[in-house]
């Protein structure tokens, strides 16, 4: 009888130890930076999922001019990020995540810029106003709080390795870009043989960083700030769209920009049948004229770049 009691007590004690070990393991896992980022940015993911701009991008509803300008916004963003990563490559809170050969995108983006704009592309482009705020934030973090740089690196590169491949196919199909990669070098990671395995390595390195819980929480907060900067770009896009709509009504635009055969335009043909041609303005030509405004071009570019960044998070 006593032996049975001892055996029972031994089993109970063993179960308690196993339960305690499991609980401790779960606590440690939830304290991992990758898990904290995943849980801590869920709300940002939810907002992104309901963005019409992202849905349209997935459907291939994007024009080549906007894609060119999106590449411009990405170029300035990654130039800032990689400049600060280079500055902090020996910092203990970032050094294990320094993978220039595998991850850096500036060189690839330079090739894309040359493809879209020509050799003198640097003379033709400027950083969008809203994107400039994000660039300034990255520089501030790199120079003053480098322990938070991981928030921006993880958000961008892990997303690019995941959803970026989907975006590449969408862009090539919608814009009829060469299958050999011209114009989409940004999405090509030549030195990463297996994206899934590399992401696992990156997360393991990130989780092994010697950071206290307070710093980890600040990193999660910084990752959410990155999303907020992107959402501000959308707000600017909406405001610019309303402003330009008013400008269109006030200023007007030349009929078909004075080019092409008006009789071949479906809009004018329909209006002529209704006897309502005089005073009408083709919406297609109006839109094209609006898109030629530099201010809108760069705002739309930032919007497209934002969509790419947000969409990439879905596939992480």
UniProtKB/Swiss-Prot annotation:
A soluble form arises by proteolytic removal of the membrane anchor. S-nitrosylated by BLVRB. Heme b binds at residues 45, 154, 199, 203. Residues 2-295 are cytoplasmic. The modification S-nitrosocysteine is found at residues 265, 282. The modification N-acetylserine is found at residue 2. The record marks 160 as: Important for catalytic activity. One of its GO terms (molecular function) is metal ion binding. It is an enzyme of class 1 (oxidoreductase). Residues 13-27 have a biased composition (Basic and acidic residues). It comes from the Eukaryota. Gene3D superfamilies: Heme oxygenase-like. It is found in: Microsome membrane; Endoplasmic reticulum membrane. Keywords: Acetylation, Endoplasmic reticulum, Heme, Iron, Membrane, Metal-binding, Microsome, Oxidoreductase, Phosphoprotein, Repeat, S-nitrosylation, Transmembrane, Transmembrane helix. The modification Phosphoserine is found at residue 2. HRM repeats lie at residues 264-269, 281-286. Changing residue 265 to R: Abolished S-nitrosylation. Its EC number is 1.14.14.18. Residues 1-12 have a biased composition (Acidic residues). It holds the Pfam family Heme_oxygenase. InterPro entries: Haem_Oase, Haem_Oase-like, Haem_Oase-like_multi-hlx, Haem_oxygenase_CS. The chain crosses the membrane at residues 296-316. This is Heme oxygenase 2.
């Amino acid at each position: 009888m006593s032996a049975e009691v001892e055996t029972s007590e031994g089993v109970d004690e063993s179960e308690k130890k196993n339960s305690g070990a499991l609980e401790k393991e779960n606590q440690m896992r939830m304290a991992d930076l990758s898990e904290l980022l995943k849980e801590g940015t869920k709300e940002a993911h939810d907002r992104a999922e309901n963005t019409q701009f992202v849905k349209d991008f997935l459907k291939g509803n994007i024009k080549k001019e906007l894609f060119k300008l999106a590449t411009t916004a990405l170029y300035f963003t990654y130039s800032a990020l990689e400049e600060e990563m280079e500055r902090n490559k020996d910092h203990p809170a970032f050094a294990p995540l320094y993978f220039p050969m595998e991850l850096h995108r500036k060189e690839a983006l330079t090739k894309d810029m040359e493809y879209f704009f020509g050799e003198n592309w640097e003379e033709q482009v400027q950083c969008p106003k809203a994107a400039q705020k994000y660039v300034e934030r990255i520089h501030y973090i790199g120079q003053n709080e480098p322990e938070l740089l991981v928030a921006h690196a993880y958000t961008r590169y892990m997303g690019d390795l995941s959803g970026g491949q989907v975006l590449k196919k969408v862009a090539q199909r919608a814009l009829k870009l060469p299958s050999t990669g011209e114009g989409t070098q940004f999405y090509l990671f030549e030195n990463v043989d297996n994206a899934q395995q590399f992401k696992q390595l990156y997360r393991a390195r990130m989780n092994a960083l010697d950071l206290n819980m307070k710093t980890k929480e600040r990193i999660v907060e910084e990752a959410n700030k990155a999303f907020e900067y992107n959402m501000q770009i959308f707000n600017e896009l909406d405001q610019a769209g309303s402003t330009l709509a008013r400008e269109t009504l006030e200023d007007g635009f030349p009929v078909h920009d004075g080019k092409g055969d008006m009789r071949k335009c479906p809009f004018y043909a329909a209006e002529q049948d209704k006897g309502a041609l005089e005073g009408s303005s083709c919406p297609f030509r109006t839109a094209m004229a609006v898109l030629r405004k530099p201010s809108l071009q760069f705002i739309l570019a930032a919007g497209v770049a934002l969509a790419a960044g947000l969409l990439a998070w879905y596939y992480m």
